[in-house]
Amino acid sequence: MRDQFISLALILCVLHSACGLYFHISETERKCFIEEVPDETTVIVNYKVELYDPRSNGFMPSSPGIGMHVEVRDSDDKIVLSRVYSSQGRISFTSHTPGEHVICMFSNSTAWFSGAQLRVHLDIQVGEHAIDYAHVAQKEKLTELQLRIRQLLDQVEQITKEQNYQRYREERFRHTSESTNSRVLWWSLAQTVVLVCMGFWQMRHLKSFFEAKKLV
């Protein structure tokens, strides 16, 4: 019971986490992030690009002419999304296979801005945190109680997806372990057979040598 409670708490921590950060890149640099995503889960990527201004020794709040090429690949290395966006945007996609999704970003560099330093603000939201409940309440005309029930149902659904994903990972790990153990066993048997054959051959060779020398 205690282990189940700890597992549930960890899942809730994962569900309530969002990746908010910023990083610096040059225009020729490619930056990638890995996000563990269950299947049929919505992922929202919010980003904003700022250009370094050497005159003010800071970053411009807007970067006209600079866009970001965003590419998303799923756990099977298939492209989920790949296109050029503006310097600030909101990207949404839904996972169809569970596992690691790689989100890569790089600028659509031009000769004018070539070699410039960029600051990229990035916020990745997964699952029910990617849902704008204020918009949902307004669109579907939900009361506060109905909206809260909707949020709880979405949280339960996301917890179920996370649990299914953990079972999927455990199954893959078990399959990998069994496959590795099987290969180790067959390799050990092969080594044993080779050693027995070499020992038998050496005994035959020594016997022939002693007979030739008339020592036996």
UniProtKB/Swiss-Prot annotation:
Segment forming the signal sequence: 1-20
Domain of life, source organism: Eukaryota
Chain ranges of the GOLD domain: 30-126
GO biological process, one term: Golgi organization
Residues in coiled coil: 134-164
Function as written in the Swiss-Prot or TrEMBL entry: Eca and bai are essential, though not redundant, for dorsoventral patterning of the embryo. Specifically required during early embryogenesis for the activity of maternal tkv, while the zygotic tkv is not affected. Involved in Golgi organization.
Protein name listed in UniProt: Transmembrane emp24 domain-containing protein eca
